[in-house]
Each structure stands twice: as structure tokens, then as C-alpha cells.
From Swiss-Prot:
Superkingdom in the source lineage: Bacteria
NCBIfam families for the chain: recQ_fam
Additional note from the record: The stop codon of ypbB overlaps with the start codon of recS, suggesting they are translationally coupled.
Protein name: Probable ATP-dependent DNA helicase RecS
Swiss-Prot/TrEMBL GO biological process terms: DNA recombination; DNA repair
Binding site for ATP: 38-45
Cellular component, GO annotation: bacterial nucleoid; chromosome; cytoplasm; replisome
Family: Belongs to the helicase family. RecQ subfamily.
Pfam families, per database record: DEAD, Helicase_C, RecQ_Zn_bind
Stored SUPFAM superfamilies: P-loop containing nucleoside triphosphate hydrolases
Amino acid sequence: MTKLQQTLYQFFGFTSFKKGQQDIIESILSGKDTIAMLPTGGGKSLCYQLPGYMLDGMVLIVSPLLSLMEDQVQQLKARGEKRAAALNSMLNRQERQFVLEHIHRYKFLYLSPEALQSPYVLEKLKSVPISLFVIDEAHCISEWGHDFRPDYSKLGQLRKKLGHPPVLALTATATKETLQDVMNLLELQHAVRHLNSVNRPNIALRVENAADTAEKIDRVIQLVENLQGPGIVYCPTRKWAKELAGEIKSKTSSRADFYHGGLESGDRILIQQQFIHNQLDVICCTNAFGMGVDKPDIRYVIHFHLPQTAEAFMQEIGRAGRDGKPSVSILLRAPGDFELQEQIIQMESVTAEEIADVIRVLEKTEERDERRLRDVLLQYGVGETQARMMIHLFMQGKTSVELMKKEISYRMELKLEKMHRVSFLLQRDGCLRQALLTYFDESYEPDDGNLPCCSHCGFDLSLYEQKGERSKMAPLDSWSSELHRIFSLQTVGELN
């Protein structure tokens, strides 16, 4: 048994790696900058956690996902690793200060890109050796990526300030142009690239047409009642997530709830935990749900709407079947779906007058901390996405109405272009899997016939239906107390 295999078994209890993991880890251990693409459920976290036990110094993980940070830290602690912490907005001032004052004691530190931009945090990080700088969801760096986050664009410069540690840039879905953008912005021209297929052959792909929205609702009810769960229903808006969850609860025997970014942090975590621990059968949600939720046995994902990008679609269906067992993705399509998504994107549009007002507000704000600026804009009534983009442009010195309007219009055009492309992919004749893989510049060789492919190639949906009674669930109040326990954990106690 090699040292790598010994470490894998000692700290994670596995006797073998998932496809692609070992090559990525060996690249990291050789000290090379690495760009890695693994499909959702491919085991990305192990690719940096295992090297952490074989390298001196801290592993610093930048992630935009609060739920992912908390989940990963709890998993590490459950395995007996006390040297893990997350530095984000969920910590109160005292907890945050404790982590920073004891920063030399941590092996794994998760933090948001916003936290990393704090001069105080940066100075503390400079005092410890960093063996690996991990950028999770690396596609957020690129304007071509489906989830561009302006805060990510500064990570290349921040890496230099931290002493230029080796980088691992991770993503589950990215096109060639997005990956090239990531390489350029992080200055990773000589990085080793390990790009695994986005294909998930254990997930059958199905597109169904409905006459109207009412028919789609009826079909969701039917699918949730009949399919083997648990499952996720992705919805276009917060309102739809809440309404569909209500319909499912009133018309089926399934335990359902809704989830979106507008819920209080405690409510979001409670719903996640109830779902993970089988106290809910189905979650109706916006795209705020799923990333960082580690549940391997999700059996189906339903899209009640047209996704905005092919990348988002692949990530969202990838929540299913992470245990490798047969699962199904179903997209429900009806007239007007495209126009609805177009309206949602165009809601991000702002007039020249609104931009001028925002610039005046930003210029009057004495504190130029990005978090403070964002809070000001949110109080002013600017949307989260708009606020992120406007502050990014403002901090770059693009403070004229014309420049800001031009950049925002460009972003909207990119989003509309991507939506047109995914709409075309999902409506064209031919194998759906092949069309999606072609979008990601992958060739596709059909399976030998053992695994169902897509609705064009044909498969029997009854294969994914329940075979017996729904399993009974634990009382919900057990997780209310567990949530209280999680929030009551003292950072001091965890390290001592």
C-alpha cells in the first residue's frame, strides 16, 4: 500500500479513489498549480483535504457557499479533525476574533472571498505558512462563467499577497473559454489541467412538454407521488418554490418544504439538515439550494422551468445520484417558459438615472469596505446581483454612468446569450446527453445499453418509481434541538 493509499484509508476510510481524484492529488503533492474539473458528486473536497494531511502548513479554501463551508467543517470535525474552521458572516464578532487570534492552530480554513479582502484578515493569514490555496467554484472568476462573482476577480492579486502558494482551482462545469479565463485571471498559464467529463451516466435525462403551467403543476404532483425519493424541484422564483411546496404537501403524502435565499440563515440550515437526514422527501427551491448540500441518495431532480444556462442545468441535475445509483432528471416545458426567464434576467436591468443615484450613494459612503457598500445598496433597494456588479465596477474606478451602464448591459447580453443556447439545446431533436456534452466540448460515445440515456433515446420512467411504502421519518423536533446544538458549539471547545 502506498503512502497515498494509507492516508486515504487512515483519514477517510476509503480503499480506492474516485475517477480523477488521484491524478489531481498527485499534481498538488508535486507542488504544481492545478486546475481540476470534476462532475458534481465527484469528490472535489477530498482532492484538497487529503493533501492537507501530507503537506506542512494550512490549506486555505475560498468558497462562495456558506452552506458548503459549514457542512465541510462539520464533516471534518465528525471525523475527529478539530483544526478546521470557517470564517464568514455566520460568525459573531467574538467567534471571528477567536479564529483569527488562533489562526496558526488550523489545518483547514474555509473563508468567503469577501472575508479574504479584509486587510486585517489578510495580515493574519500572512503570519502562517499556506501549503495550498484552494479556489472552489472557480468558474465564478470568469465573466463567461454562469455564476460570475466580482469578488472572485481579485483572488489572483490576493494570492500574490499571501506569498504565491500553489493553487488548486476547482469547478464542476466550465466551457473551454471559461477555463481559459480562469487561467488568465489567476495567472495559471503553466498549471496542470485535469478535466474530467461532466457526464453523469447514472442520471437519465428526460424532457416533457406541457400545455400550460397548470398542467406542469399537475405533473409535478404526479411525479413526486410516484417517483422514488428523495428529490429536488427547482423553481424559477421564490414565490413558485413556496407555492409548489404547498401544493405537494396538500395533495401528496410527501413531506415537502421550500427553500430560497430570502429565508433566514437558521431556517435555511434547518431545512437543509432535515432534508439531509431524511426528515423531508422533497425540497422545492430556487437555485440557491443544492450547492454544498452533501446528500448522496437524491433520486430525482425536476426542473419546473427552463434553466438559465447549460452549466447551471448540469450542476443542478448533478445533485442526483451522487452515490452512483440510477437517478433521473426531468425538465418540464411549457409555452411562455423562455419569456419568464427572459423577464427574470431583464429585472437586473437598471436605467441611467438609477445608476447615477447609486454612484451618488456610493460616493457619499465614507467606509469603502465592500461589505459596507453592499449593505448600503441593499438598504437603498438595489438587488443582490446588481449590488455586487456595481460595487465591483465602482471599486475599479468605473464611476461614470456611461461606463457602468455599458458593463451591466454587457453582462445581461451574456446571460441572454447563454439562455438562448440552453433553450436551443433542450428543444432540438436528437440525443439530449450528446447535445449537452457537445456544449462542453466533449465527445460522446453512447453507453453499451445498460444505462438509460434520455427521452429521445427512450427509457422506462417506471424504473425510477417507488417500489414500496415511503420510509418513516424521525420527529422534526429532534433536528430543532440539533440545530440549537450546532449553533451553540463554542469555537474554544472545538479546538481544546
